[in-house]
């Protein structure tokens, strides 16, 4: 039913999606997560098609600061304290910024260590960067931190792409059983943030 973290990280390293579940007492949601450096146009289209469509790109604070991407607001009133930064698009090779091609390109360039100039991105845009806590899931058990921790475990640039799964029949958020069924249908491994936390603790 649930994959081991080792199996999940291997898939993640190969550029495959994972479904990551948080605790039922938290958001009780499953996010599709993929490494930012790997995401293709086709995968971005899949992500948008089966999710809320509000694609976010978690990354380290160091990466955000190096690209001079500020936080969206000074006073964060989000219930889960999700750390939204100013939206953006990659400046070269995109048109409106909203297409699967453009969003995938922007995400890959955010993950590209050779892209170092803030001027390479236009703001506002259609990708929502998220600032992960430095301590990862051990500091905050959110999908933001899970995405960055998975990148680190896979030896990839610490930039992911995430979006919440929704049910096709009614558009409501996918819960545990929905996520398990979706993963089985599409061959996507499912893990929990709790198991990721335990795995990371075991490596310390």
Curated annotation (Swiss-Prot):
Its cofactor is Mg(2+); Mn(2+). Its EC number is 4.1.99.12. Mg(2+) 1 binds at residue 27. InterPro entries: DHBP_synth_RibB-like_a/b_dom, DHBP_synthase_RibB. The modification S-glutathionyl cysteine is found at residue 56. It is an enzyme of class 4 (lyase). The record marks 126, 164 as: Essential for catalytic activity. Binds 2 divalent metal cations per subunit. Magnesium or manganese. One of its GO terms (molecular function) is metal ion binding. Gene3D superfamilies: DHBP synthase (3.90.870.10). Mg(2+) 2 binds at residues 27, 143. Keywords: Glutathionylation, Lyase, Magnesium, Manganese, Metal-binding, Riboflavin biosynthesis. One of its GO terms (cellular component) is mitochondrial intermembrane space. Homodimer. Catalyzes the conversion of D-ribulose 5-phosphate to formate and 3,4-dihydroxy-2-butanone 4-phosphate. HAMAP family: RibB. PANTHER family: 3,4-DIHYDROXY-2-BUTANONE 4-PHOSPHATE SYNTHASE, GTP CYCLOHYDROLASE II-RELATED. This is 3,4-dihydroxy-2-butanone 4-phosphate synthase.
């Amino acid at each position: 039913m649930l994959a081991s973290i080792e199996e999940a990280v291997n898939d993640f390293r190969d550029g495959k999606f994972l479904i990551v579940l948080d605790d039922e007492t938290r958001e009780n949601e499953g996010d599709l997560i993929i490494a930012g450096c790997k995401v293709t146009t086709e995968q971005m289209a899949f992500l948008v098609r089966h999710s809320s469509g509000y694609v976010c790109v978690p990354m380290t604070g160091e990466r955000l600061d190096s690209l001079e991407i500020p936080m969206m607001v000074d006073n964060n009133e989000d219930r889960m304290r999700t750390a939204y930064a100013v939206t953006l698009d990659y400046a070269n090779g995109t048109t409106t910024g909203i297409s699967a091609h453009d969003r995938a390109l922007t995400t890959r360039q955010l993950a590209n260590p050779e892209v170092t100039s803030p001027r390479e991105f236009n703001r506002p845009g259609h990708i929502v960067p998220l600032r992960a806590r430095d301590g990862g899931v051990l500091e905050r058990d959110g999908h933001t931190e899970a995405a960055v921790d998975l990148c680190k475990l896979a030896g990839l640039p610490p930039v992911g792409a995430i979006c919440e799964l929704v049910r096709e029949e009614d558009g409501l958020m996918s819960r545990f059983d929905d996520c398990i069924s979706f993963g089985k249908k599409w061959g996507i491994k499912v893990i929990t943030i709790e198991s990721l936390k335990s795995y990371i603790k075991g490596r310390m």
